[in-house]
Structure formats: structure tokens, C-alpha cells
From Swiss-Prot:
Residues with PTM O-(pantetheine 4'-phosphoryl)serine: S39
Post-translational modification: 4'-phosphopantetheine is transferred from CoA to a specific serine of apo-ACP by AcpS. This modification is essential for activity because fatty acids are bound in thioester linkage to the sulfhydryl of the prosthetic group.
Membrane-spanning ranges: none
InterPro entries, sorted: ACP, ACP-like_sf, PP-bd_ACP, Ppantetheine_attach_site
UniProt superkingdom: Bacteria
Name of the gene this protein is made from: acpP
Location of the protein in the cell: Cytoplasm
Gene Ontology biological process terms in this record: lipid A biosynthetic process
Pathway stated in the Swiss-Prot or TrEMBL entry: Lipid metabolism; fatty acid biosynthesis
Naturally occurring in which organism (per UniProt): Synechococcus sp. (strain JA-3-3Ab) (Cyanobacteria bacterium Yellowstone A-Prime)
Keywords, ordered alphabetically: Cytoplasm, Fatty acid biosynthesis, Fatty acid metabolism, Lipid biosynthesis, Lipid metabolism, Phosphopantetheine, Phosphoprotein
Stated role: Carrier of the growing fatty acid chain in fatty acid biosynthesis.
Protein name: Acyl carrier protein
Pfam families: PP-binding (PF00550)
Upper taxonomic lineage: Bacteria, Bacillati, Cyanobacteriota, Cyanophyceae, Synechococcales
Length: 81
């Protein structure tokens, strides 16, 4: 799975879950500061990532996923393992 493919899928999930335009979901975008997510939204995003990519993200790891790039990097690291 390529980084571009992961980014595309993460971008769609974030856009759908948070109701923001695709073009606002950049790699640098912070879920809370830039995209308006609250803590519940963040939990729901992590759950959506788990389902989409068939992986489990422990709470301590989820706390470190603040940006779109963080999510992409985390997913890539788990899928490469």
C-alpha cells in the first residue's frame, strides 16, 4: 500500500467524518486546530481508521495522532510490519 493510497483513504474518512471539504484535509492539517474536531470526533476518526485499514490502534498510540500526516505515517508503519 502506497503513501498516496493511504492519504487518499484517510482524506476521504476525515472529510466524511468531520464534514469538511477535501481540499482542507492536507497532510499538515491538525484534526482539532485546523479541522474543528473535538475529542469525540478524534475517537471516531481513530475507529474509522481501524475499520478502513483493518488494524487496531491502542489508546496510547491514538493520542499521538493529531494530524493527517500522523495518521498516514502510523497506518503505513503498521501495514509494513
Amino acid at each position: 500500500m502506497s503513501a498516496d493510497e493511504v492519504y487518499s483513504r484517510v482524506r476521504k474518512i476525515v472529510s466524511d467524518q468531520l464534514g469538511v471539504e477535501d481540499d482542507k484535509v492536507t497532510l499538515e492539517a491538525n484534526f482539532q486546530n485546523d479541522l474543528g474536531a473535538d475529542s469525540l470526533d478524534t475517537v471516531e476518526l481513530v475507529m474509522a481508521f481501524e475499520e478502513e485499514f483493518d488494524l487496531e490502534i491502542p489508546d496510547e498510540d491514538a493520542e499521538g495522532i493529531a494530524t493527517v500526516q500522523d495518521a498516514v505515517n502510523y497506518i503505513l508503519s503498521k501495514k509494513a510490519a
